């Protein structure tokens, strides 16, 4: 495929400072990358190898400037509708990838850069602000707030300009993955450490929020689910290995005993926040611990449930229904050669793990949400094997309904990719030997089949909880291209939903056919039909977030960021959810000042005022 020719392309780069920012924004020593004159001229054409390479890399260009005082954004198309609710759209993601000493890190290891878009419907304006999350790692790596020296490896990176051999600073909590407003607090989360609390108006970092400590203080709400265990000798061996690993992981690599996942769930029916944590040693042992926490609107612990699953799994996202927590297990294994290379510092620490494709099915664990469900159901430690090998990426929704057998029908709407494509430290095309990302990894020849796509998992349980049928199919036959970041109207979480929205590929660019996404697809799961809105030219889009206004399931607006990388611009886009697929779906587009253009965000959150 032609995209394979992108990999060896390495054009010269020139560093220069940003233009002066607006008065109310704080400017650090900004650096951005541009092509040489020859490369820039070639990239002027939309669909060339050069344009594809530079557009892709500009999507992950560092932004060192912060906007401490909010500024109004200029409307470039349309207008803010009068029925748009007052509230704030928060977007988490990395802000910086390269330091001043020659190191470039994986996008997943970039320091958290929180963006805020505050809607004031009274005066029909949107105010923007942005700040780095002041984590302990950020304060160490940028002591004066201007210059940067990366000292932490992070799980996915190798420091070209920093200490490699003997560098045990692996757990680099960058608070860059997701953002949550709950119980009067705004939290930035990362896959493996404490959340950081941030002031919801000023975005000033308050400090780490000890969520697990808060839960441990109320352990009388904890219940341990029982399950059939392995032979006692095997279990004793795993227990001994865990006891040996914990002090090493904690004392040497500074890993917390439990790592909180960055993906959370909100149960609107019960008014609860649901979160899950894993044990640190689970990454290295063929056994997985999961602790689920449920908090009320005041951040008081309502319930805590613990499960031990006899499988070596990696979980990024998960689901829940009225009676179950649901894990779609991504099977992994320890990579011994990779582990040795990782310990030397010459390979990323994540190289110690590899996908385990030996089984051609996907384990689905239905974990009872209450002791009552556990008492009346199946052995939850035995997974339901979905008849398709897939790597679970993100979950849009899950729900359950009573069926004619006296049991339950469970449905999940999610994105998944192929084990054949998924590669831990090559995600986004990262290669620690080079300072540029390789677009061809995310645009592989078999990308249409291998990259994330939208699927439905359907499970039929009888009255005893036994699985009678499990199936996996595309969510829509009309849209078979890669798609991810599934979202729904949050009012319909944990109940039957009709619509799913996701970032998607239109396939309009020959050399970037699959990623980055350039469209939003709206799937009607009742009939499998699909409609979409696409940006034009050399532009990409991020995760869609639904803002409900009433008037039915699709009564509301879809927010997303458009990255016009060739023009060094970002726009906040407002779509009418009902009109996606028509010419007038675009309601408004607002421009972020050029000097504040930011790299691709990961996950966002809408909070009503």
Curated annotation (Swiss-Prot):
GO molecular function terms noted in the UniProt entry: 9-cis-beta-carotene 9',10'-cleavage oxygenase activity; 9-cis-epoxycarotenoid dioxygenase activity; metal ion binding; oxidoreductase activity, acting on single donors with incorporation of molecular oxygen, incorporation of two atoms of oxygen
Cofactor(s) named in the record: Fe(2+)
Catalysis performed (reactions): 9-cis-beta-carotene + O2 = 9-cis-10'-apo-beta-carotenal + beta-ionone
Transit peptide: 1-34
Pfam families on file: RPE65
Disruption phenotype: Dwarf phenotype with increased branching and tiller number, and strong reduction of the root levels of strigolactones.
Cofactor comment text: Binds 1 Fe(2+) ion per subunit.
Broad class of where this protein is predominantly found: plastid
Residues the entry annotates as binding Fe cation: 263, 316, 394, 603
Organ and tissue specificity: Expressed in vascular bundles of roots, leaves, stems and panicles.
One Gene Ontology term from the biological process aspect of the record: secondary shoot formation
Inducing factors: By auxin.
GO cellular component, one term: chloroplast stroma
Entry EC number(s): 1.13.11.68
Compartments, record wording: Plastid, Chloroplast
Role of this protein: Involved in strigolactones biosynthesis by cleaving asymmetrically a variety of linear and cyclic carotenoids at the 9-10 double bond. Produces one C(13) beta-ionone and the C(27) 10'-apo-beta-carotenal. Strigolactones are hormones that inhibit tillering and shoot branching through the MAX-dependent pathway, contribute to the regulation of shoot architectural response to phosphate-limiting conditions and function as rhizosphere signal that stimulates hyphal branching of arbuscular mycorrhizal fungi and trigger seed germination of root parasitic weeds.
Family: Belongs to the carotenoid oxygenase family.
Stored PANTHER family: BETA-CAROTENE DIOXYGENASE, CAROTENOID CLEAVAGE DIOXYGENASE 7, CHLOROPLASTIC
Additional detail: The branching phenotypes of the ccd7/max3 and ccd8b/max4 mutants can be rescued by exogenous treatment with the synthetic strigolactone analogs GR24 and 4BD.
Protein name, per record: Carotenoid cleavage dioxygenase 7, chloroplastic
Classification lineage: Eukaryota, Viridiplantae, Streptophyta, Embryophyta, Tracheophyta
Gene that this sequence comes from: CCD7
């Amino acid at each position: 495929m032609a995209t394979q020719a992108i990999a060896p392309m390495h054009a010269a780069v020139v560093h220069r400072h940003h233009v002066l920012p607006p008065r109310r924004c704080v400017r650090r020593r900004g650096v951005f990358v541009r092509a040489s004159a020859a490369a820039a001229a070639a990239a002027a054409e939309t669909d060339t190898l050069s344009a594809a390479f530079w557009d892709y890399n500009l999507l992950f260009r560092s932004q060192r400037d912060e906007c401490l005082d909010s500024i109004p954004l200029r409307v470039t198309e349309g207008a803010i509708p009068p029925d748009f609710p007052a509230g704030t759209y928060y977007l988490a993601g990395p802000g910086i990838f390269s330091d001043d000493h020659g190191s470039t890190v994986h996008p997943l290891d970039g320091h958290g850069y929180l963006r805020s878009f505050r809607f004031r419907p009274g005066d029909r304006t949107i105010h923007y602000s942005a700040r780095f999350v002041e984590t302990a790692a950020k304060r160490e790596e940028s002591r004066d707030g201007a210059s940067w020296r990366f000292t932490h490896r992070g799980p996915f990176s190798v420091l070209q300009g920093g200490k490699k051999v003997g560098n045990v600073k692996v757990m680099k909590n960058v608070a860059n993955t997701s953002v949550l407003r709950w119980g009067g607090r705004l939290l930035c989360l990362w896959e493996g450490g404490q959340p950081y609390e941030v002031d919801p108006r000023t975005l000033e970092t308050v400090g780490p929020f000890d969520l697990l400590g808060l839960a441990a203080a109320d352990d009388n709400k904890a219940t341990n689910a029982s399950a059939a265990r392995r032979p006692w000798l095997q279990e004793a061996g795993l227990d001994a290995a865990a006891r040996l690993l914990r002090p090493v992981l904690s004392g040497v690599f500074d890993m917390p005993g439990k790592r909180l996942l960055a993906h959370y769930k909100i149960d609107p029916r019960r008014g609860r926040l649901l979160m899950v944590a894993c044990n640190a040693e689970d990454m290295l042992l063929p056994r997985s611990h999961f602790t689920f926490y449920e908090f009320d609107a005041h951040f008081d612990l309502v319930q805590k449930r613990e499960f031990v699953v006899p499988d070596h799994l990696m979980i990024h996202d998960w689901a829940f229904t009225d009676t179950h927590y649901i894990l779609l297990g991504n099977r992994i294994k320890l990579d011994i050669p990779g582990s040795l290379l990782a310990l030397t510092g010459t390979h990323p620490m994540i190289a110690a793990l590899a996908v385990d494709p030996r089984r051609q099915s996907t384990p689905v664990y239905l974990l009872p949400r209450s002791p009552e469900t556990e008492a009346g159901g199946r052995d939850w430690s035995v997974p339901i094997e979905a008849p398709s090998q897939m790597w679970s990426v993100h979950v849009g929704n899950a729900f359950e309904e009573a069926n004619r057998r006296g049991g339950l029908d469970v449905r999940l709407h999610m994105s998944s990719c192929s084990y054949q494509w998924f590669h831990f430290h090559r995600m986004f095309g990262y290669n620690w030997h080079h300072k540029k990302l390789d677009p061809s990894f995310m645009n592989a020849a078999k990308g249409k089949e291998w990259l994330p796509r939208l699927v439905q998992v359907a499970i039929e349980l009888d009255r005893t909880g036994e699985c009678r049928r499990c199936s996996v199919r595309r969510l829509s036959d009309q849209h078979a291209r890669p798609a991810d970041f599934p979202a729904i109207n949050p009012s319909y979480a944990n109940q039957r939903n009709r619509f799913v929205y996701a970032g998607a590929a239109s396939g309009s660019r020959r050399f970037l056919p699959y990623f980055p996404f350039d469209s939003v697809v709206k799937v009607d799961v009742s009939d499998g039909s699909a409609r979409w809105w696409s940006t034009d030219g050399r532009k990409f889009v991020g995760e869609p977030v639904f803002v409900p206004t009433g008037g039915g399931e699709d009564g509301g607006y879809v927010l997303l960021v458009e990255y016009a990388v060739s023009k060094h611009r970002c726009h906040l886009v407002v779509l009418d959810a009902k009109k996606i697929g028509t010419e007038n779906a675009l309601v408004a587009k607002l421009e972020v000042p050029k000097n504040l253009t930011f790299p691709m965000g990961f996950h966002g959150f809408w909070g009503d005022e």
